[in-house]
Amino acid sequence: TIKPFACTKCKRRFCSNKELFSHKRIHTGRPFVCAVCGKYFSDRIILQAHQRLHTGEKPFTCTQCHKSFLYKRNLHQHQQIHQKHKPYVCSTCGKQLKSKLTLNQHMKTHSNIKPFACSECSKSFRFKAHLHRHQESH
């Protein structure tokens, strides 16, 4: 791909002048500011996505179960639960899973590594959620 538009600061090249213009903001700072919390962003689109945190808007909705999400990537990840096809297979036990994320989480069940320790009694857990559930018992 020919990239005729070059940044004068870092020499990175782009296919269009629009991409170059957007890129240049990383050198000039973050001109877009959230009116609610004051956080700065280098891109207006990123600011708009951030503002949904404050409004509670979740514009990406699953067509199968109608659950809504803040970000499109979370919707795509969620939609994998509706698949019947399970292309990821655990090399230890053969269990079939729908996503690489769930395979990675499943693999922890075969490990002795327990990185989440209770600060009160030092009991350790494989998953952060299990630690939180345990801490409620103190």
From Swiss-Prot:
It holds the Pfam family zf-C2H2. InterPro entries: C2H2-ZF_Transcription_Reg, Znf_C2H2_sf, Znf_C2H2_type. It is found in: Nucleus. Keywords: DNA-binding, Metal-binding, Nucleus, Repeat, Transcription, Transcription regulation, Zinc, Zinc-finger. The keyword Transferase does not apply. A zinc finger (C2H2-type) spans 5-27, 32-54, 60-82, 88-110, 116-138. Its main location: nucleus. One of its GO terms (cellular component) is nucleoplasm. The keyword tRNA processing does not apply. Gene3D superfamilies: Classic Zinc Finger. One of its GO terms (molecular function) is DNA-binding transcription repressor activity, RNA polymerase II-specific. GO terms for biological process: regulation of transcription by RNA polymerase II. May be involved in transcriptional regulation. Belongs to the krueppel C2H2-type zinc-finger protein family. This is Gastrula zinc finger protein XlCGF44.2. The lineage of its organism: Eukaryota, Metazoa, Chordata, Craniata, Vertebrata.
